[in-house]
Curated annotation (Swiss-Prot):
GO biological process: DNA damage response; somatic hypermutation of immunoglobulin genes
Annotated positions binding GTP: 107-114
Name assigned to this protein: Nuclear GTPase SLIP-GC
Main location: nucleus
Species, as recorded: Mus musculus
A family per Pfam: Dynamin_N
Function: Nuclear GTPase found in germinal center B-cells, where it may inhibit function of the activation-induced cytidine deaminase AICDA. Reduces somatic hypermutation in B-cells which may enhance genome stability.
Annotated InterPro entries: Dynamin_N (IPR045063), Nuclear_GTPase_SLIP-GC (IPR053082), P-loop_NTPase (IPR027417)
Localization annotation: Nucleus speckle
Effects seen without this gene: B-cell and T-cell development is unaffected, and germinal centers form normally. Class-switch recombination in B-cells is not affected. B-cells in older mice (3 months onwards) show significantly increased somatic hypermutation near the immunoglobulin heavy chain locus, mainly at G:C base pairs. Other loci also show increased rates of somatic hypermutation.
Length: 796
């Protein structure tokens, strides 16, 4: 009775589909009409049909849930099968209708990320644009929602998080009393030190950089800090919110007198969320993420920088036209985005070249040695150069991706790996048309991602719901679906045998890592001195590096800045291992061709073998006229094994990071020792401590331990998969067994819900066919429309 009351106490929330009252129904219809206004009419129709399918399914599940709860409300105990069904129903009812699609804008300061987002949402100057004296200071997430107003939430570091950073900042800024003049000059010119000093001056006033940690703790910050550590801003118009938001998300690169109270707290800002009203340009469910710089000195913000990159399913590496061909920071960000494909959720990478309208025609013609040939206008030259850049950078990007990812990775099949955009021309149209600015092309890509994701999620949702409604039939009878098979133990034995085969297949799949991992360790052992030297020795000597190195040591081998190149000694030392394992690792966790020897393919093979056996059992049990019994079992298998994918995605990040994390953990004592060094020749002494520490750890098995820790993570994943599959399949077979006398007469009559769910399930195909027909008609009309003139002959 107690567990029943606990279940009854949970009121299912039917997301956006509360269709039980007429006024609510009208509001929801209006909501849907506005929700899809970012899409062309053909896509709007498809999305509305999928939305209706999902809403009606959620309503059927809610009705079924309420009936089942009421039917057993007075029972002293709930049979395990019914408890399983009720919990599954509740989980499906409360499941989010659409997981956000995060699109990451990754680029250095001044690359044009904010300008690009402003153009995509068609709000000029909404986010602050980097200039000579200002830049975006934190991660900014922009999405559209159901709110009527423009809204922003500024999330601040907690008190403990700021105290931890404050302690490191003061350590970094502390100058030893006996430093010689040479060290003092170097200290004054250090970029890391200047950035740390700027943070303290901004928050506590001029002279704060000379105060000690305990003194600063007693000072009150100049800006107002709410107890909730969250600041909410609202406005009726975009421009109004932009003015309010501006001081929080943009910071001056140099000290500036007269900063506002809002600007004064930017060192405390963790990240900012901006929510637009329903947008006719960016669909609901899309989050555009401006990811500035290469990380942050604050550990919490730096972890968030990495995690934000990893949760993006799409990453656009932003580079302006004048920096697209080089620059260490740009190459580092490109490498970071490729790593996100390995360890994170990223499925698409593209290079977005910005500011393509910037071209001096006479210089361009002279460089191309074209004289007075075909190119006659600025527009033609810009379009030709765009095509050249696309060909060159696409080739470069593909080569990089092929070195790191399997040859059949989906990202390599993308039709557009490079975009050439101009936010300026999107607004002005003095040289290029709106289409030629390629802003609409980026919007179209986003829309297609959302439409495809919605289709897949709704199909999976309706199919899973149909399986649950079939389960009520199973629980409502004293007969077993698989009585003979279960009684003879045939099916259980079959599952156990297949489980053993799955376990061996997973072991063989992971064993492919053994050789490249071993080779990587050997290469790392022969190259670590050279790698460490390249990190510690600078062409200018120690000028401008003294306190930067101290910052590296304070953060256990990592220095990240909003404006400077990222330094990570641990990643550098582990890179030879990753160079060897990346293609194989990507192959194991790939989502490419179904014939590929990937981990999920072994799980799919296990699923298909069970489904085939269920079909055989169905034939022997006389299910030809009642395919629903077989459908229930097959769909339960799909639901059980389908849930493994998210588990594997979460675990693979930990596996991939394990090598670098292991090296960082083992080198932590030498970093801590080096961070304490002050006085004369401190920079060289810190380097010596780091070198000796690395030498000692390598001799004691630094890389071998990293190898073993990665293997440990692989073993944990294998164990987790097999245990989850065993437990879930056992539960499913138990549900297929007889439920016992008495249960059938206690359950509510949900036959109407079953019939409605059957109709919804059958309509999935019709909706998909309608969507395909609309797409074909739309493509036909586009092909028949007059084509735009392209650039004249492209020359490489």
């Amino acid at each position: 009775m107690e567990e029943m009351e606990a279940l009854v106490g949970v009121v299912p929330h039917s997301a956006d589909c509360d269709l039980f009252k007429e006024p609510v129904r009208k509001r929801r219809r209006l909501h849907r009409d506005r929700q899809f206004q970012a899409f062309p009419s053909a896509e709007q129709s498809a999305l509305k049909e999928y939305e209706k399918l999902e809403c009606r399914t959620r309503r059927v599940l809610s009705n079924t849930y309420q009936k089942l709860i009421q039917s057993v409300f007075l029972d002293d105990s709930i049979p395990s099968g019914l408890k399983y069904l009720i919990n599954r129903l509740l989980a499906l009812i409360e499941k989010s209708p659409l997981e956000p699609v995060y699109v990451g804008f990754l680029g250095i300061t001044g690359a044009g990320k904010s300008s690009l987002i402003n153009a995509l949402i068609r709000q000029a100057m909404f986010l602050p644009v980097s200039g000579e004296s200002v830049c975006t200071s934190c991660i900014v997430q922009v999405s559209s929602g159901c709110c009527e107003q423009y809204e922003a939430k500024i999330h601040l570091l907690s008190d403990q998080e700021w105290k931890a950073e404050l302690k490191d900042l003061t350590k970094l800024l502390h100058r030893a009393e006996q430093s010689g003049e040479e060290e003092a000059d170097l200290w004054d010119r250090d970029d890391a030190t200047e950035e740390a000093a700027q943070k303290l001056r901004m928050l506590y006033g001029h002279g704060a950089e000379r105060r000690h940690y305990e003194e600063l703790l007693r000072l009150k910050p100049r800006g107002r800090i709410p107890n909730s550590r969250t600041i909410t801003l609202k406005a009726e118009e975009a421009g109004e919110l932009s003015v309010k938001l501006d001081p929080y998300i943009r910071t001056r690169r140099r000290d500036w007198d007269g900063e506002s109270a809002e600007t004064q707290i930017w060192p405390l800002i963790k990240y900012v969320e901006v929510i637009l009203p329903k947008s006719a340009l960016i669909p609901e469910g899309v989050v555009l993420v401006d990811i500035p710089g290469t990380g942050d000195f604050n550990s919490k913000r730096d972890k968030m920088w990495k995690k934000t990159i990893d949760k993006c399913s799409v990453i656009w590496v932003i580079s302006d036209i004048e920096r697209v061909s080089g620059g260490k920071t740009h190459e580092d960000l490109l490498s970071e985005s490729i790593k996100a494909c390995q360890r994170g959720f990223c499925r698409d990478i593209a290079l977005v070249v910005t500011k393509t309208d910037k071209l001096h025609l006479q210089e361009y013609l002279r460089e191309r040695k074209m004289g007075n040939q075909a190119i006659q206008s600025q527009r033609e030259a810009v379009l030709q150069r765009n095509e050249i850049i696309k060909l060159q950078r696409k080739r470069m990007l593909k080569e990089k991706l092929k070195r790191k990812l399997p040859a059949d990775s989906k990202v390599l099949e993308a039709s557009d790996l490079v975009y050439t955009v101009s936010a300026h021309e999107y607004w002005q149209r003095t040289i290029l048309t709106e289409e030629e600015s390629e802003i609409p092309k980026l919007r179209e890509y986003i829309r297609k991602r959302i439409l495809d994701k919605k289709r897949r999620l709704v199909t999976k949702y309706v199919t899973e719901a149909f399986g649950l409604l079939l389960l009520t039939d199973t629980l409502n009878t004293e007969e077993s679906l698989l009585t003979e098979e279960l009684n003879t133990g045939g099916l259980r034995q079959f599952v156990e045998e297949k489980m053993e085969l799955l376990e061996k297949a997973i072991e063989q799949c992971f064993a492919r890592m053994e050789q490249p991992l071993q080779t990587g360790v050997q290469v790392a052992m022969t190259s670590y001195r050279r790698i460490l030297g390249s990190c510690l020795v600078r062409s200018r000597g120690n000028q401008g590096f003294h306190q930067t190195l101290k910052a590296v040591c304070l953060k256990n081998g990592v220095y990240a800045s909003r404006t400077l190149a990222r330094i990570d000694l641990n990643e550098a030392l582990s890179q030879p291992i990753y160079d060897q394992i990346d293609p194989v690792f990507g192959g194991i966790f790939r989502d490419g061709k179904p014939t590929a020897p990937a981990l999920m393919q072994h799980i799919d093979a296990f699923k298909h073998s069970l489904e085939e056996r269920m079909a055989e059992v169905g034939v022997r049990s006389g299910w030809k006229q009642d395919g629903y019994k077989r459908s229930f079992l097959i769909q339960e298998i799909s639901a059980i094994l389908g849930g493994l994918e998210s588990h594997i995605l979460r675990r693979k990040r930990k596996i991939y990071k394990s090598v670098t994390s292991s090296i960082q953990n083992d080198l932590k004592p030498c970093y801590e020792e080096a961070a304490q060094i002050t006085g004369k020749k401190a920079c060289e002494r810190m380097k010596d401590v780091i070198r000796r520490g690395v030498e000692r750890q390598v001799a004691e098995g630094l890389f071998e331990r990293a190898q073993e820790r990665m293997w440990h993570q692989f073993r944990q994943l294998k164990h987790g998969i097999t245990e989850k599959v065993k437990g879930s399949i056992t539960t499913m077979l138990t549900l297929a067994a007889p439920q016992g006398v008495g249960l059938c007469k206690e359950l509510a009559d949900v036959r109407n819900e079953q019939k409605e769910m059957e109709k919804l399930y059958r309509s999935l195909r019709e909706v998909a066919e309608n969507a395909q027909l609309r797409r074909s008609m739309q493509d036909f009309l586009l092909r028949m429309s007059p084509s735009k003139a392209g650039p004249h002959g492209t020359k490489l």
